[in-house]
């Protein structure tokens, strides 16, 4: 019953108020909500792991590993499916992150991304210090011409943090993800 009331409350706040929605804070059993995926699903040899940690009163996910390009590979990611609907007027995603001074991506899948290789992506660079990065939905690029040019926030199905596209060591901590 509490779960249902929480769900209804989130929908109400998101739909009526149009305020910030906490997508993830890595406090309440994140290991049950996040999936670690590598290019091994398609024959690649990238490897890594996700850990859920706590340090200095911060709970966060740490994704680490090696991105390799052999066998048409080139990614590792953590992904979470949405269990609520985002307000169509939401404009951006905000993440609190730190890492190894490398470029990473957010991949968004919507009800229109039918094939496994379809997504919308935006890049960001992390530093070794915690920082907040804002990514406007209008700046996400579609992975192919078969997709609509723009993301309709109410159709978002999942959000992923991705190390992608070049050989490198991945090391990124994600403390919070907010949609607003």
Predicted features by range, described:
Residues 9-17:
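Hydrophobic h-region of N-terminal signal peptides that target proteins for export
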